[in-house]
């Protein structure tokens, strides 16, 4: 029994989980003016017709539901059934039954209900039903004031057995509607629709509810008659009211019809032309079968005497709403017609109805919200980095190849904030945000962590510890050189003798080994000579008894005496006088080396004479003179090494730290430069061209080449749509195929294949006795249309760069294209060729804001498009909707006593879904600084994927006598500095530069300290005051950065901040991509000493307490030296 209860509980939980659905309501992250409401809907699986009539919506949200929806609403229920007498079955063998039914919470909104709910902070929750004769599919709609997003994140709605989790999702739009990944703001002015070239057009989903209200201003049938051009009588006595609509799930109420609002005009047109709207098919119901019984008329309400509504009876999956309102009565006769399609065709005046709820796409004019750039910050967090991205107008797309970017976003005020974690900081962090490539230099994060660690260890003196830490934590050799320099200065008087002693011990150890080895080799040589001499004069030195080879004569005599007597000649132990016994004894005897040692004592001196070992023993490593000499020498060497290593290694070889000045080129021959330049890079070349005959005559040359601009003349193809393909079989037993109008006939894209008068007993359902009388209609149509992107076809593409040349006082500029040249009297600059991935005829597809880049299609259909091709469903801007062709073949599948079913062997997957499945096979491109119209797109490539082949030739024929004098005078002043020295991010120096004596002057301004320049900016100066910002990387704590032009610098400099733990800002790649070459000399020995002196002066002028602490440590080391190594006292003789 308990097992059964447990099983029931588990099954009940599983059933409950299946009945929980999501309703996601998208809303902008700012509340705009007006009575803006947001809406959403959710469709559910079918219920029985009896259960559907008992539904009541419930809500657990903290906003009250509007009370009027809890009232009971009465409708006329119309159902159809077969006639009782089936003896002579024909096309009229069925009948309708009218009755009154009551619903609670049905979407029968009252006048001013939505407006009142906005003012009272209440929600409107209702439902609609799509039914056949046996079951219904409910759809729940919810309208809430936009303030709900500030009051709740989610809530729960109940409808019968179903539960709806309402989730409010903030988009990155400020106030607009999210469509195609862009934020669209509709414009209601009619003039914007007339001047479409000035505005964008977007397809927006709209939900409309009919409001019944009597009054002269609400004669909706009169408006329909006027729009359709039909001549209907007695329109004053027909239904009165209006539609209230929410556009894109986020808008103020739109009232239709309204002649002064273009949005209302488009909505009203959509309701008239496609009154059924979008179908209610659930996933898996794309392929379905209808059996049409025929047309019939009914009485609305059931108490009237004459029939006033035409309907079409069917059996099959319900796809469209079963609620409507009778058009012929001004009293508001609401209809519930399960299993019947009401006649919604407004081209006829009688026996028709209006939809109670309408949902569909409409084309609206308006504009897209601007895309704002991103700010990305990172801080070190554990083994990785914690980063945040901000954007004023929201973030539409953020990705990173090395970070974990969550899609759960949160907002802060008017900006959108996204936090994410990067697991590795051993390489720079790259983030793509709102179409911009940001690089966070993690070197600075590591510097900050190092500073924090050292400061924490010496927390008693935090100021001093921080000043020392910022010197020690510079990455690379420079940091180690700094550590060595500080240690030598503070503890050198103790470490020098200690290290010297350790070195002497090691050297003496090796000297002793070498001395012993030399003695042993010398002794072996003596033995060898003695043995050879003995063998020459007296014979063998082998004992005759034991056969042992002796080394000396004394040893041989001992063998001759002892071996005969059976004794060991070495230890005098008794043993048998046989060779085997004595040889075995020798192996264990401990005195076999006795005669060898005696001889060694005789021939080897016992004391070690003067040599390396004795010299090492006599070395006076404790001498104060030696320690002072080494201390001073080490400080000088380490200072030079420290200064030489103070330059930062750049990310890419775009800037190389060098000394002041500009390089010179003697013009013996023409000066030619030939190189390849990435599309994202700028190029600056500056030299002094000198007269080969007279070095005193020179002309300044400055060439600046801007980054590549890409301009494409395009044809705006329109919006590309994703869609769902439906295959519906409609069978009716009697009549021609043209007898009935099916709901899919009002879809934008549909195709029908008819099999007329082909039914027989082998292809009929049991209730159809006719033979050769009916029709099987196979309908293909597209629904759930959703715009996904914008397509442009390239007519021509142009790659260009702006080139400026300053030759002496001559200043010229020109924008040149591929295979074009800029020719002056002395210079010729050409773009010989461009390596590109764009070509004429390509199609550019933007799946979102154009700032985010796009995809290149080499094959995009424009004329004959099949469903499933790229570009299959298109909505051109100023042309009718373009539908694809369906090239597959239809087949009618028949079985005995079974309703025929249509089969289609063509493709059923949309082109957009196919592209998404294989998107990695297409070429993509990123864009920056994009500007676009319907006819032209201009942008820059931030990734440097394209390259230009550039050739520069400077003629040697220069009139140096007339061009050597340059009248332009430049004045410099350092105004402000931001950033940090020595860090990966660098600093930005703001310079005030004045120009006199000439109107314009192209030159470069550098950011330098006393010795080295760390960055430059090529700029065209105008007469008067100019502001120039220079970005540089490197320097040290003593660097005073000045604005320099050539060898002249501003009188005062500014010091940058130290690297610290503040957030590291991302660098835009376009701002950082520049190649600068002015031929300035590299830093030499004099430059190194300048850097060292500037550093020392910086410490003295800055935190002088550091110097005092270092001197105290030096004094401590001297005292420690006197204790450990006291001065030797010499006694007077």
Swiss-Prot record:
A zinc finger (CCHC-type) spans 543-563, 568-589. One of its GO terms (molecular function) is zinc ion binding. Residues 505-626, 1126-1133 are cytoplasmic. One of its GO terms (biological process) is signal transduction. The record marks 646-647 as: Cleavage. Residues 514-531, 586-603, 590-601, 609-623, 1120-1133 are annotated as: Binding to the ribonucleoprotein. The chain crosses the membrane at residues 485-504, 627-647, 1106-1125. Glycans are attached at residues 132, 233, 345, 397, 926. One of its GO terms (cellular component) is host cell Golgi membrane. Residues 1-16 form the signal peptide. Residues 609-632 form the ITAM domain. Keywords: Disulfide bond, Fusion of virus membrane with host endosomal membrane, Fusion of virus membrane with host membrane, Glycoprotein, Host endoplasmic reticulum, Host Golgi apparatus, Host membrane, Host mitochondrion, Host-virus interaction, Inhibition of host innate immune response by virus, Inhibition of host RLR pathway by virus, Inhibition of host TRAFs by virus, Membrane, Metal-binding, Phosphoprotein, Repeat, Signal, Transmembrane, Transmembrane helix, Viral attachment to host cell, Viral immunoevasion, Viral penetration into host cytoplasm, Virion, Virus entry into host cell, Zinc, Zinc-finger. Residues 17-484, 648-1105 are lumenal. Residues 755-775 are annotated as: Fusion loop. A motif (YxxL) lies at residues 613-616. It comes from the Viruses. Disulfide bonds join 61-155, 107-126, 131-136, 173-183, 208-245, 232-349, 374-433, 378-387, 403-422, 450-473, 733-768, 737-775, 749-883, 763-894, 778-902, 804-813, 821-830, 861-865, 968-998, 991-1043, 1008-1013, 1044-1049, 1083-1087. Pfam families: Hanta_Gc_C, Hanta_Gc_N, Hanta_Gn-B, Hanta_Gn-H, ITAM_Cys-rich. Belongs to the hantavirus envelope glycoprotein family. This is Envelopment polyprotein. It comes from Seoul virus (strain SR-11) (Sapporo rat virus). The gene is GP.
